Each structure stands twice: as C-alpha cells, then as structure tokens.
C-alpha cells in the first residue's frame, strides 16, 4: 500500500485491501524514497495499491510515487485509487514504465470520506484472475459456485443466516 498520509489514505487503502482478501505486506506514506521502493521490491507483493490525495487536492505526492513505481523493477499490477484529478496522468506515467494498471475510484475522495468499494472490487478481480491461478485454486472454479478471499467469505457467511449473501444468490 502506497499512500500520502498514514492515518488517512494509507488507512483507507489498507481497509480496501484487507476487505478484498489481500494480505498487506507493507505500507508507506508520503513521497516514496529509494529505500522504501527497495523494501517494496524485496517484499514481492502480488500487487501494489497506489493511493493518495483527495480529489482535486495534493497531486505532487501521488505523481512522484507513480514516477518512482514506473521506474522500478516491480513486475506486478498496480491498482491506482487516488486523486481523480490526476488519475489519467498517473496511469500514463505507469504505462510508460511498462506497468500493468488497474484503475479504481479514489479511496478517499474528500477528507474523512472513505470510498473503498471500487478499489476493493479491483483487488478482488485481481485476486480471482491471478492469485487463485497461481495458488492452484482455479481448479475449484467448476466445483464451487464462486471462490472468495477469506474476509469476503466470512462476511458472506455472516450474511447467510440473515437473508443470504451475494455468493448465495449466484
């Protein structure tokens, strides 16, 4: 998780990631330094969630972070879920760096307003496309109606006794 401020966009990004079933192996805030980028590379995450700035707010930090990620050796998808005003520019920067990009709505469009669902859904899609295949879970697709990350499965399990969860309706 890469974000601007530890208690704001980084926290929102962690909520999105954890709610989608991702394992957060690290987080960094403010402008990415070379040392922090090396730590991300060493952690070898399945994906990076790039967040920061409210919509129309600070753009310098997230653009700097996009440039740092673009120039890195990281070879995993990057989910961009930050300042909407510069989302296109971030994707362009990352694309020029040869990165696979997934775009989602800002996890914190306004200070104090969490909007993690779009990022959570992109992370879940990546989980389904990549992680399940890499871990051999794709073999279950014909045997069960849907494969869910553990946190989502637990939430669905809680919903079932009170009227049926989303997975039960599929």
Where are these regions (language model features)?
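Nucleotide/phosphate-binding catalytic cleft detector across ATP-hydrolyzing
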Residues: 1-168
């Amino acid at each position: 998780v890469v974000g601007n401020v530890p208690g704001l966009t980084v926290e929102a990004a962690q909520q999105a990631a954890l709610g989608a079933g991702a394992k957060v192996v690290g987080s960094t805030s403010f402008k990415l330094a070379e040392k922090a980028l090396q730590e991300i590379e060493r952690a070898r995450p399945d994906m990076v969630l790039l967040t920061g700035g409210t919509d129309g707010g600070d753009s310098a930090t997230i653009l700097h972070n996009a440039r740092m990620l673009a120039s890195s050796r990281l070879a995993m998808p990057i989910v961009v879920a930050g300042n909407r005003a510069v989302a296109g520019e971030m994707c362009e920067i990352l694309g020029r760096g040869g990165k696979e990009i997934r775009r989602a709505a800002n996890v914190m469009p306004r200070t104090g307003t969490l909007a993690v669902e779009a990022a959570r859904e992109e992370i879940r899609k990546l989980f389904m496309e990549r992680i399940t295949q890499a871990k051999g879970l794709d073999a279950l697709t014909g045997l069960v109606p849907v494969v869910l990350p553990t946190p989502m499965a637990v939430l669905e399990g809680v919903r079932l006794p009170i009227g049926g969860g989303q997975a039960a309706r599929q």
